[in-house]
């Protein structure tokens, strides 16, 4: 049986053979059908993953299990005050359980990954949430070339617009600064994020995490120097020999920018 609309919400990216199942679901669509999915985005989750890393690293330094009652208390001291300011639909406990310490949160995708898969199935990206592709608003309909309707051409436009808006996804709101990273730089950024996310598997917590040039560049050249300073400071603190949780908590909660970032 074929369907006009298929909704696959919040699970595809967690599957071991996710590319296979993505294509399998598409095979159940009627011509012109819509597939609606959501997923954990590797770039959009940057600061959410940083929160997890801060928690895991703080707990590791003090031989505390992140999923224990003590781990929850540390998370509350770090994040609860700002969490309570959000327009939210779940409790802090649920967020801690579902996101901060959940290993499935590290099973990420990106729009790039999905576009590559869509191209192999002649599928085009129709829309996103949030909406960031405004390129079509600037073109007179009589000037549209049939080639513009080619799925790969449509998808490439989405990718180009997505790259320009990358900082907005990182920070969680529109900062009005377009950026265009190369594929190599995007890969380096993803590499850093995935290194942080090894903490979900209790790996690499005994090692210092190195900030690569791309991560530095993103913060330095895009009117984000205050974000950069606080980010570098917290990483330096986590990389240090201190096991003083209160010192880490104090720096994070007193930060101006860092504590207000969400995935």
Protein language model regions, located:
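A short beta-strand submotif of the Rossmann-like class I SAM-dependent methyltransferase core
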Residues: 8-11
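Short catalytic/ligand-binding loop motif for oxyanion handling, primarily in non-cytosolic enzymes
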Residues: 14-15, 43-47, 133-140
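A short glycine-rich, Lys/Arg-flanked "PGG" loop and its adjoining helix->strand segment in the class I
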Residues: 19-34
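Rossmann-like AdoMet/SAM-dependent catalytic core
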Residues: 87-263
């Amino acid at each position: 049986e074929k369907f006009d609309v298929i909704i696959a919400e919040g699970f595809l990216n967690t599957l071991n053979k996710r590319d296979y199942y993505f294509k399998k679901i598409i095979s159940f669509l009627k011509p012109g059908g819509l597939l609606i999915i959501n997923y954990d985005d590797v770039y959009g989750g940057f600061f959410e993953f940083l929160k997890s890393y801060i928690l895991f690293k703080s707990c590791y330094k003090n031989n505390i299990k992140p999923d224990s009652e003590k781990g929850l208390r540390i998370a509350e001291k770090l994040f609860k005050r700002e969490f309570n300011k959000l327009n939210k639909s779940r409790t802090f406990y649920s967020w801690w359980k579902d996101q901060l310490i959940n290993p499935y949160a590290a099973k990420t995708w990106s729009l790039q990954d999905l576009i590559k898969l869509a191209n192999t199935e002649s599928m085009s990206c129709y829309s996103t949430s949030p909406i960031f592709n405004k390129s079509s608003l600037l073109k007179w309909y009589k000037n549209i070339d049939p080639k513009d309707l080619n799925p790969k051409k449509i998808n490439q436009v989405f990718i180009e617009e997505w790259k320009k808006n990358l900082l907005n996804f990182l920070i969680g709101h529109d900062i009005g600064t377009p950026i265009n990273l190369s594929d190599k730089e995007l890969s380096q950024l993803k590499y850093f994020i995935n290194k942080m996310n090894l903490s979900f598997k209790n790996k690499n917590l005994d090692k210092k995490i190195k900030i690569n040039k791309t991560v530095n560049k993103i913060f330095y050249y895009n009117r984000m120097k205050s974000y950069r300073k606080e980010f570098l400071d917290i990483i330096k603190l986590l990389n240090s020999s201190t096991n003083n949780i209160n010192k880490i908590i104090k720096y994070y909660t007193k930060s101006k920018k860092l504590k207000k970032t969400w995935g």
